[in-house]
């Protein structure tokens, strides 16, 4: 029967393909993030343990190394506790120099996770001893081994150089190994610390993972860690008095901030599937009504009602299977487009997107959706027809009409389509306003014509001093020479560098005190800190509001100085007193000097565009040259910033040919790919697409309903007109039928929207979840479209010739 009506079949299959494809694409992301078991032994026993401070400033979900050692020796709720931290390294000895992000781990890290190398061996106790200039062994991830070493099975024992230090590859990690909170880290080495780092209890940088002991629960671990934390606060009030310890499932860290986003998208595509089912159900109902004489005859010849329902369900299943096959193709295209649109930086932020594919669980999901879809849109029409007595079928056939129950079912399906369309359009409208609000924000600097990239200087030729203040004169010398050379590159207007880029969600914090203000040990507040060179503010076009900026005279031999932003002044000098001349001191080391505040600069979106600028302190990198080892350079150009990249590379390689650039891109691209914009723009694109599709389907459904109603009421319309009804009366009568359904659907949709949009509140910026403008525009838009969709068939109804209609009847 499906081949006899190719138009019906094509419309139904395409509708289902779009809906099933969207559900498949989103589920292929949801599965690796929220549902797939972590690739570790007994992953439900793995937890993250971290420290944070509740006062203003940046608070990292990380621990200090001394606290980690205390936890490891004291906590009985854990079978083992391990730590890791990320860093950037330059690898040589395998082609061109390449900067990669690597992880430094305690030697029990992989045994804690329950991971065994697929080739080679694990790290051994003692390989993380602090003696020497760095790690001597390393393990590679499967993907890095495959991409950079050609899956060479003889890789074990090979020596490469990390930051100029020879390192022996001792193992290859399993193919499915991935620690999402750490990002994409292709190289793993044992942790090596200098004496200061091992003793710095106030320095929080180590991410900690624990494996619960047999019989221990998460709550028991939390209670025990709180008790240990209280003891440490009493023993070390200067560093631990204001520290809070958090213990949570490792799975929670995997999803992070994207969990609510994925759930909302999954709900959106689910609603889209319901609309598709309602639309196809209406098509099936219309088609089954046209076949009612066939069903009546078959029933009279002995066919049971169950047999008729099964036949319609089989036809529905065939439609669903065809839709699923096309949907899989559509989902594959969608996944390919997603992969193409993501930058390496975004994949580092959300590395689980590397696992988005049509895996077996995803295929199983498609199978389940296919069967469910067939039942949803095939069962109702089948039951509606099979439950009608033969006499009613023949009577309705002779009158050309349909039963009230069938009309109510068709109306209910259209109302459901309109209601769901309202929900999706409201969600899309809120996301649109949120994206526009974020894009209109002033980041505090001018991103146009800026080129940015990271250079990591290898430890060999650029050694960091082993004692405080950990200076790196070679790194500082490179930075100055590089910036001076950039000044001679055609098209370069200015060049500078910073320890951290704005809008990067990479806040670096230090505890500090203001001179003359009594602060109890451990009660110091944390503040976002950036180390920058003297040309940073002019290059970025960040205004100096009061005082002065930095100069190259602000070096290691000069008076220690600092700049602060307006947010810092408002928080620490709320009485309006001038902050210039005040002195502050970082408390990370007793030897840290007081720094005089010499200027106040404008606020910059350091965290993300949608977050208020945090109180920030800027320190000249010339006075803390250790931070020049990993430095983000920013170059302002007179034209396209990416066009000068070859000349910029040449300037760097003229100084050191073994340096590599990381994440070289324009600042505009960097900001557009930042989580603040990306995690709002993509949901808007997706939800907006679903909303438009839902609107089209609902419009088609309403148009089809009124058209079918007109065709079934030809005799009634003819009688009305024969009795004197004017064409305007017929027009209003027919349009009113569509408007009643539309209004009902809009009201139901608005009620649902009021409830469901609360789930989106955390994703919105600059707009409330119950924004009155959105809740006004969407109903007006839908009602306007409903009038148009109803007018066309209603207009056709007014052209009925009463005599011809009565004669045909």
Please place each PLM-identified region on the residue numbering.
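Alpha-helical transmembrane segments of integral membrane proteins
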Residues: 1-9, 250-255, 283-310, 314, ...
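Membrane-helix entry/capping segments
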Residues: 1-11, 40-41, 96-99, 130-131, ...
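Short, strongly hydrophobic transmembrane alpha-helices
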Residues: 5-33, 275-277, 320-325, 410-434, ...
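Alpha-helical transmembrane segments
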Residues: 18-47, 334-345, 420-449, 707, ...
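Membrane-proximal juxtamembrane linkers immediately C-terminal to transmembrane helices
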Residues: 26-51, 75-77, 116, 181-184, ...
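Small-residue-rich transmembrane alpha-helices
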Residues: 28-29, 281, 317-393, 433, ...
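Mid-to-C-terminal secondary-structure elements
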Residues: 88-89, 101-127, 135-263, 336-341, ...
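Interfacial "coupling" helices/loops that link adjacent transmembrane helices in transporter permeases
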Residues: 276-320, 700-742, 746, 759, ...
């Amino acid at each position: 029967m499906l081949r006899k009506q190719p138009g019906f079949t094509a419309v139904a299959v395409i509708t289902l393909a779009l809906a099933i494809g969207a559900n498949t694409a989103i589920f292929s992301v949801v599965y690796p993030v929220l549902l797939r078991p972590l690739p570790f032994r007994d992953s439900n026993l793995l937890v993250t343990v971290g420290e944070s401070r509740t006062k203003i400033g940046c608070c990292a979900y990380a621990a200090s190394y001394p606290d980690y050692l205390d936890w490891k020796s004291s906590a009985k709720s854990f079978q083992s506790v391990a730590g890791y931290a990320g860093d950037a390294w330059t690898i040589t000895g395998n082609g061109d120099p390449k900067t990669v992000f690597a992880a430094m781990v305690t030697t029990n890290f992989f045994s804690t996770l329950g991971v065994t190398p697929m080739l080679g061996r694990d790290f051994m106790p003692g390989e993380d001893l602090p003696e020497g200039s760095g790690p001597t062994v390393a393990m590679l991830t499967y993907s890095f081994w495959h991409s950079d070493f050609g899956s060479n099975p003889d890789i074990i024992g090979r020596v490469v150089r990390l930051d100029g230090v020879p390192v022996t590859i001792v193992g290859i990690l399993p193919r499915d190994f991935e620690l999402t909170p750490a990002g994409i880290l292709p190289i793993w080495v044992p942790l090596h610390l200098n004496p200061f780092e091992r003793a710095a209890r106030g320095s929080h940088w180590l991410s900690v993972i624990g494996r619960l002991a047999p019989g221990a629960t998460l709550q028991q671990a939390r209670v025990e860690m709180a008790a240990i934390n209280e003891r440490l606060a009493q023993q070390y009030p200067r560093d631990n008095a204001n520290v809070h310890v958090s213990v949570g499932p490792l799975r929670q860290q995997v999803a992070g901030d994207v969990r609510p986003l994925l759930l909302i998208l999954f709900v959106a595509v689910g609603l889209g599937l319901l609309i598709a089912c309602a639309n196809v159900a209406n098509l099936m109902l219309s088609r089954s009504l046209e076949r009612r004489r066939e069903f009546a005859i078959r029933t009279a010849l002995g066919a049971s009602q169950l047999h008729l329902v099964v036949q319609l369900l089989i036809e529905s299943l065939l439609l669903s299977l065809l839709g699923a096959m096309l949907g899989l193709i559509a989902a594959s295209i969608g996944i390919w487009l997603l992969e193409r649109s993501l930058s390496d930086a975004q994949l580092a932020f959300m590395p689980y997107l590397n696992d988005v594919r049509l895996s077996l669980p995803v295929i199983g999901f498609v199978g389940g959706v296919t069967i469910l879809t067939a039942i949803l849109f095939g069962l109702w029409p089948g039951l509606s027809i099979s439950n009608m007595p033969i006499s009613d079928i023949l009577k309705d056939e002779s009158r050309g009409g349909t039963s009230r129950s069938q009309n109510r079912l068709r109306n209910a399906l259209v109302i459901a389509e309109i209601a769901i369309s309202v929900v999706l359009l409201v969600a899309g409208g809120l996301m649109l306003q949120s994206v526009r609000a974020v894009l209109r924000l002033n980041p505090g600097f001018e991103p146009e014509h800026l080129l940015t990239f990271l250079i990591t200087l290898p430890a060999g030729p650029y050694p960091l001093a082993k004692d405080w203040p950990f200076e790196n004169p070679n790194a500082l010398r490179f930075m100055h020479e590089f910036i001076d050379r950039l000044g001679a590159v055609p098209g370069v207007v200015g060049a500078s560098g910073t320890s951290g880029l704005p809008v990067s969600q990479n806040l670096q914090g230090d505890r500090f005190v203001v001179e003359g203000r009594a602060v109890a040990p451990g009660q110091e507040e944390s503040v976002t800190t950036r180390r920058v060179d003297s040309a940073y503010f002019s290059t970025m076009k960040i205004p100096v509001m009061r005082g002065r900026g930095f100069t190259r005279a602000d070096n290691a031999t000069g008076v220690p100085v600092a700049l602060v932003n307006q947010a810092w002044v408002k928080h620490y000098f709320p009485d309006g007193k001038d902050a210039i001349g005040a002195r502050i001191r970082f408390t990370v080391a007793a030897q840290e000097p007081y720094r005089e505040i010499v200027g106040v600069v404008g606020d910059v979106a350091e965290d993300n565009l949608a977050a208020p600028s945090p109180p920030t302190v800027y320190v000249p990198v010339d006075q803390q040259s250790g931070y020049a080892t990993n430095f983000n350079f920013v170059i302002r150009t007179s034209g396209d910033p990416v066009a000068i990249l070859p000349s910029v590379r040449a300037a760097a390689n003229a100084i050191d040919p073994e340096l590599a650039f990381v994440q070289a891109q324009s600042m505009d691209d960097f900001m557009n790919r930042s989580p603040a914009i990306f995690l709002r723009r993509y949901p808007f694109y997706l939800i907006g697409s679903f909303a438009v599709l839902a609107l089209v389907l609902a419009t088609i459904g309403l148009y089809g309903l009124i058209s079918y109603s007109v065709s079934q009421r030809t005799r009634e319309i003819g009688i009305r007109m024969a009795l004197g009804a004017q064409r305007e009366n017929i027009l209003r009568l027919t349009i009113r039928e569509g408007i009643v359904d539309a209004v009902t659907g809009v009201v139901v949709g608005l009620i649902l929207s009021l409830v469901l949009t609360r789930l989106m509140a955390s994703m919105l910026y600059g707009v409330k979840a119950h924004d009155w403008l959105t809740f006004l525009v969407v109903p007006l838009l839908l009602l306007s479209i409903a009038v148009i969709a109803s007018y066309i068939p209603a207009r056709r109804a007014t052209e009925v010739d009463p005599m011809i209609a009565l004669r045909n009847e």
